Amino acid sequence: MNITKAELVISAVKPEQYPDSGRPEVALAGRSNVGKSSFINKMINRKNLARTSSKPGKTQTLNFYLINDSFYFVDVPGYGFARVSKQERQKWGKMMETYFTTRETLKAALLLVDLRHPPTKDDVMMYEFFKHYEIPVIVIATKADKVPRGKQQKHAKIARETLRLAAGDSLILFSSETGQGKEEAWAALLPFLTE
């Protein structure tokens, strides 16, 4: 995929702020600090369009990135150990649920999990949520460069088993450092962007 243009269009907190262009959208979900911003930057060959942070829970809005004027990456708030109040977390949860269950232009979701560790309960719940609402899901196992090559498949197998990955759902090993998995991720995404 040749990316010629990428821009952050809006950081939205409520549905009336979502773009209404009708372009297809792919949501990125995952724990705080799993590497969603780094994933976006690597996929579109930019250093810092999506701002990365060492402080978990930085993304508190739905960030709509318009790519090539043709589709959106939507970065949703990270779940897990974001340092916010329970009330804030519930507010985010509601915002995410509203987006995932009512957004007609949402074509697929990318669930990012950390390849170094088995998926968390939150990861499993998120995967089951997507399956329940029949949102096509592609699992991206990030930080693959931190796992020795010889052990990557073993870690991938643990991830598949923990998530109880459905037949036909992809799990792609990805590294924003080396670019491993980038072509594969685009290949998995393209069918949803060209419907």
Curated annotation (Swiss-Prot):
HAMAP family: GTPase_EngB. Keywords: Cell cycle, Cell division, GTP-binding, Magnesium, Metal-binding, Nucleotide-binding, Septation. Residues 22-195 form the EngB-type G domain. The keyword Cell cycle applies. GO terms for cellular component: cytosol. One of its GO terms (molecular function) is metal ion binding. InterPro entries: G_ENGB_dom, GTP-bd, GTP-bd_ribosome_bio_YsxC, P-loop_NTPase. Belongs to the TRAFAC class TrmE-Era-EngA-EngB-Septin-like GTPase superfamily. EngB GTPase family. One of its GO terms (biological process) is division septum assembly. It comes from Geobacillus thermodenitrificans (strain NG80-2). The keyword Cell division applies. GTP binds at residues 30-37, 57-61, 75-78, 142-145, 174-176. Mg(2+) binds at residues 37, 59. This is Probable GTP-binding protein EngB. It holds the Pfam family MMR_HSR1. SUPFAM superfamilies: P-loop containing nucleoside triphosphate hydrolases. Necessary for normal cell division and for the maintenance of normal septation. Its cofactor is Mg(2+).
